[in-house]
Amino acid sequence: ALRTARELRESGGKERLLWTTGSFLIWDYLRTASDEQQKEMAEAVRAGDISWHGLPCTTHTELMNGPLFEYGMSLSGDLDARFGRKTIGAKMTDVPGHTIAMVPYLAKAGLKFLHIGVNPASTVPDVPDVFRWQYEGSEIVVMYNRDYGKFTMIPGTETAVYFAHTGDNHGPQSAEAIRQVYRELEEEYPDAQLCAADLNGLAREVLAIKDTLPVFTKEIGDTWIHGVGCDPWKVRQFREMLRQEPEWTEEERKEAFRELLLVPEHTWGMDIKTHLADHEHYVRTEFEKVRKTAPNYQKVEASWEEQRDYVRRAMDSLSPEHKGELLEFGRDACPDGSGFVPVDMDGEYSAAGWDFRFGTDGSLRKLERNGKTYADDSHRWGEVLYENYSPAEYRDFYKAYNTLDVGWAREDFGKIGMETAIASGIKTTPVLKALLRRDNEFLARMEMKGTAHDLYGAPAKWEMRVKFEEEAVSFALRWTDKPACRVPEGIWCGFCPAEGPENCRVRKMGSWIDPLSVCTGGGMHLHATDCGVKWDGGQIATLDTALVSVGNPKVMPYTKEPIRPEEGFWFNLENTIWGTNFVMWYDDDASFRWVFREQM
């Protein structure tokens, strides 16, 4: 980019390259480059060859919390201070949507314009092409494109914007390629005056007509957010670090956040269609053999470990005291059974003012307090579900969601070859094998055997600890003996309130978002939360997993079915439905925690 932009500028022609990228790339380059390289970059910035926008990179934004999102925007602020600029424009590319909870943060950082370019095969949320996105007294002007960026007229003006993108994982164009872009535009728009610009220039043009733009106040959400459920270990560690962040020093925060910022970045490993490139070996016995020996399998698994290193390096940047706290967290999520004694699995019990009973699957089939019912036989709490998805479900999803039927889209959004290993979907729940008690704590031990475990990826052993206290009921779930499985799967834990839930909300980045106020084509069912869910009567905090489906468990990223909160809140513990560059199988032990508190 430096060489091409300089070559075009020094040639004296009308063609220019003003290369714009997320702030992280330039910020990190200047942090690590040699003195000579830093000098070259500084000269390019001052000459107008290189520019950054207000966001560090494209993220699954609702996986973040407010402080991490603000840190990401501070990198642009650091560059602005260094070079005497004021960035007002930002861009997200590929991910189809983001949460409205980020609007106040964008405005607070001085950003006024956001361009969102959607993956060309994905459903575009039903929003105006250009609009004022408003939330909690703040706003950002947004331009939406059905592609990474395309020719777009700015409403009410004679100005248009054209994005000259290269493809995924490609660098900037050559000088001749830039000249060809100019020739093609001049041929198509012979009366136009062409001018290279960055996002700040585009922002100023759009802001000039801001008062004429429609106002939009609905949540959009992220129809790709299911991807972050593919690695429970990474998400669990990430969330715990964000919870402990207020205890860190400022220096610790900067060092750790530099690594943690790349966890919600939307690339989680190598491109599967390129580097795994295997439409066979879905049957588990065949998969287990090839996984041990094939270089392509080992290569993609190594890329997933490399992604986990962001969390490991963030942890290593902390003081011994704070690192020790992270190493200790959650180790007692499910106790080893010491001090517990067996009790009747069919019995009814009372503890700390709660009356309750466990079901044959280990879930709570009764939970009452002070005459109020939270769980019953039809509204279970802590209900575990394992499911595999069928070729028919993928075909239905593909037809409903995908707007472009080409080879790369079928690879990214499908599971080509899975029909050799599964014909129809599977749904399995565990069987309660033992119930133990220690004071106000109960430990349910379950098993999940049969086809789901023998042929697919269902964990064989499960434990749910439920602790009853005056102010709360806490749940801790653990699985062990989970086989890896290439057939796409989803694992859930559901909480279905018996009364309501009226006025339910999902918290994202510190804001309580109404899941019934999501635009068509947006992230309607599945959400990432930084805290949990609430309704008139209660609140459930989720400590270790981010994903929650409002209504029945839905991990497929698009549906036109209405949202039914009365069917409960289903927390997705793990899923492998995505293609692209996410984790394709998972066999680690895992544990998850939730805390329920009444709200009067």
Feature-to-residue mapping (PLM):
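Catalytic and substrate-binding regions of extracellular carbohydrate-active enzymes
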Residues: 250, 254, 262-268, 272-479, ...
